């Protein structure tokens, strides 16, 4: 198993410690206790970072205290993860953009947010190490095809906290368009099945962000589909 120590655990863990774990939920093991009898001599305490190791920006703890997040608006690591999620199979499903290629695009300053994928210089892409004209043509075709995706895929791709593929499908079929979702109130959102108040607030916060608004407008200009192909189940948003 791989254990993550980003949680604020009430356990004094030191580097090199042996711990007892148990299965918690479906995936993540839970650390129960440290086996002090096996602690290495001179073991050093583990300290959570106060700054991002990539961009150096301060980190903040989630409201629920479960994780630390980088506050750097232009953090390369965040951009890499955001782009990888945006193009993933459950999101916009853009084939041919693995993590190594995404990092190439970032290093070459060819992308600074997901909307830049729809304005790629494919001639320049073909000149990148390991690429070529065929790879560029295949990527261009995949990017163009993604413009026709259902709204649910775009909602998933945006990376709104707690809005995965399942919630994205419910939201898309309920509101019918991205514009309608952007204009939804807290009451509108919490009335949607499986959308609780925390998720609803995350959605409102996302759309209130100038950075998100800019991304959405750039996606609109690129003719990315903002409509759901599924029947709208709530006529209030038709």
Feature annotation, model-predicted:
Residues 10-12, 234:
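Short, surface-exposed secondary-structure edge patches
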Residues 26-94:
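Cys/His-rich short segments
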């Amino acid at each position: 198993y791989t254990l993550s120590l980003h949680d604020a655990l009430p356990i004094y863990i030191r580097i090199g410690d042996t711990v007892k774990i148990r299965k918690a939920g479906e995936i993540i093991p839970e650390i129960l206790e440290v086996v002090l009898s096996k602690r290495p001599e001179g073991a050093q305490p583990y300290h959570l970072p106060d700054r991002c190791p990539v961009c150096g920006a301060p980190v903040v703890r989630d409201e629920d205290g479960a994780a630390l997040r980088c506050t750097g608006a232009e953090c390369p690591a965040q951009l890499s993860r955001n782009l990888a999620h945006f193009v993933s199979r459950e999101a916009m499903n853009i084939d041919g953009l693995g993590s190594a290629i995404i990092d190439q695009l970032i290093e070459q300053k060819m992308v600074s947010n997901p909307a830049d994928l729809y304005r790629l210089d494919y001639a320049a892409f073909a000149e990148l190490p390991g690429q070529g004209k065929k790879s560029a043509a295949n990527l261009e075709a995949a990017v163009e095809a993604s413009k026709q995706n259902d709204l649910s895929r775009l909602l998933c791709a945006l990376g709104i906290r707690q809005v995965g593929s399942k919630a994205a499908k419910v939201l898309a079929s309920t509101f019918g368009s991205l514009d309608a979702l952007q204009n939804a109130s807290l009451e509108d959102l919490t009335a949607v099945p499986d959308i609780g108040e925390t998720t609803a607030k995350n959605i409102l916060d996302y759309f209130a962000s100038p950075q998100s608004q800019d991304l959405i407008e750039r996606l609109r200009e690129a003719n990315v589909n903002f409509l759901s192909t599924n029947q709208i189940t709530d006529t209030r948003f038709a």
